[in-house]
Amino acid sequence: PSVRRRRERQSCIRDRLCLVEALPLLLAKYSADAPRLADLLAVVPHMRLEVYHETRNMEAFESLWDDVCAHFMRHVHPVLLQRAARAIQLLATAPMAAHTTTSRLATLKESVLSLLQDTLYQRQVDTTVFSEDDVHNLQASLARVYTLLKAMDASALLDDDEPLWQHMLALAMRGRLQYDQEKTFVHYALSSLALYLLWRTKRAIDDDTELVSRRDEVLQMIHMFLERGSHVQATVLHVALILHTLFFTVRDDLRILCPEEIQTRCATQFSTELQTLVPLYRAQGKSIALLDTDMHISMLASAYVAALRVGALGVQHAAAILTYYGHFHSDFDRMCHEAVEVMRDDAMHSDRAWAVCETILEALKGSMQLYFQYKDTEPRLVSLARQLANATMIRGPGFSVVRAIDANAMVTLHVATVQQFVQYVRDGGHEGHEAKLFKALVHLVGTLHPSDALKIHATMQQRLAAAHVEPEQGNKAWDPYFAYEKRLLNVAAKDAHLLHTAQPT
């Protein structure tokens, strides 16, 4: 075994040395083939860069730096840019590059920004009309800025350069014009501003007035977009969520609260985005296009749940994501579980049981609307109800309930849901599917006391009678209602002297 391991090590060393020699040749050979070049750049993170130092071949290391930077500046293929930026980040942090990193990054900064500055030279960015070539140049430049900021702390690109910062703000503000051809570079500008603030905050010093000023400028613009709309609303929402999450959790002198009005707009925009994606997701099936949709959903949902978890968004806004439980991929459902945990923590530990119950009702209403629309989502409605039940209790061994949500809040939730059913019946147009709501509600009976169950049952009878709604025995459409009623009476029966006061319909 020791001989085999020694041979494997020797083989690995030979491979590394061969790679040092072969990679520059391959990069030169395929310099015009962006997809192939992107594959080659993906090799760099798996290289042991110390080999250059160990073999005293720093000339080859410097040459690799030049090659990667050259390809980063020559191409605009998104995957190639991402992999080139990752390679630059690794080369910049290699120990043997310490004496050249600063100068090389400064040169790269100048190269990245020169095309941007040339395009914007002596122009009023907020009012000028960009040609097709201008749009292409801006998109390429901002894509490089964004990709670098995503891969490493490249905030020096915008530090101490107020004119450039103002240009970036102005380019992002062009989202208000809603020109289709400018959509991509507006997205890059907004995302770059957000990433800059993330990196700048990470290394912030006390009383960083420039950071506070720039943060406020970006948030003011984002809030304006949330109010008035733009053609990059998904990007606006994502930036709003990550910035408010960041600045809700930092030290006190930088901390800001997300206004309730902005929270509501974020929740509304998030729900609108998911509502738009549901039919697209259903149509794509298992196609390749589904992967991009999955990534987009995950990006927005993860930012949204993070904002809920830290408290930047109030628990009442969890309904916006929970409504769509079961309608997307499994990662989305796991993020819904995170939202349910936030609700449970609030219900049990923050005396916010009423808000949690209101959120449960809103989530059920949203899921019912999807059921009315598509007719095949009943299992998703029921699965959602099972998850929401976890927000109302803390379980112990053997599924025992160790702690439960406030009883009065739960009674109000059940009564309000019954009233929602009555409203569905009054509105009509649901083809007799209204009672499916009880198929979800039955899963929220677990924490009720006998007296609470009896109170809900009595109130339900009164509400139905007042609305002249009479459940029909033998009609399968009413089965969920009778199952719910039976469950209430079974809970009430746990207190023997209450049993005789209620009879099934």
What do these predicted regions represent?
Residues 1, 16-29, 57-77, 104-128, ...:
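Amphipathic alpha-helical segments within extended alpha-helical solenoids and repeat-rich scaffolds
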Residues 127, 132-140, 144-256:
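Long, acidic/serine-threonine-rich intrinsically disordered regions with weak helical/coil propensity
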Residues 44-48, 87-95, 141-153, 189-200, ...:
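Hydrophobic residues within the alpha-helices of tandem HEAT/HEAT-like
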Residues 249-252, 272, 276-287, 292-310, ...:
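Extended alpha-helical scaffolding segments
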Residues 302, 306-316, 320-348:
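C-terminal, active-site-flanking charged/polar segments
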Residues 479-482, 490-505:
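Polybasic, low-complexity terminal segments and linkers that are predominantly intrinsically disordered
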Residues 2-15:
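Single conserved hydrophobic/aromatic residue that forms the stacking wall/gate
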